Amino acid sequence: MEKYWRNFAFSVDEHYLCVIIHSQTNIMNIFVSKCIEIFADTTLHYHKFDNIDAKPENPYQAGTIDDVLFRKNWIDAVQWHMEDIIRDPNIDPVDALALKRRIDKSNQDRTDLVEDIDTYFRDLYKDVVPSADATINTESPAWAVDRLSILALKIYHMEQEVKRTDATEAHVAKCGAKLAVLLEQQKDLSTAIGQLLDDIAAGKKYMKVYRQMKMYNDADTNPVLYAKGK
């Protein structure tokens, strides 16, 4: 199959995040490219507001995989900033507790969306018959996509550090080196996800959808919560 270089170049004012994906021209790697583009756009969209209470303007049709990817990265962006806020040493304890509970709910919502992405893949591959020697991956495709979403946020924020005019040259240089590593990681992860999807489609690997057991949110499995009910 003919190989190609797919380039996405984004800047803070227009589009942002620089990544080069070396892959093959097939539908699976096009999906990975779509993830990168949507995550980059959504990260930028959040930072137009830079407010954890902002209401997103989702441009995608409800129920589509694009819609799920947008909502996934939006939740990640909001939670990123909630984690920043809760680490303020001067935060009011009452506010911190409320925020911690909000973060717990966000984690559950995030997990639910990841499982929605895995359900999409499971339905996509339902007619694929795995080969006799097919193997399973250490993580499902959606949890790898989850890491790709977080990487988009890391790259954005590290790029902001590189652009700071109030920082020392040493800080800018250090962050520039970290940014280069993050971009390399994004390229490698994108390639790995594409290869995993190709292997699943070819029956070389198979996947399972494990429903995550968030025990701390469940009144039946969190001992502190179920003790209250006795």
Where are these regions (language model features)?
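Residues marking helix boundaries in flexible regions
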Residues: I21-H22, M28
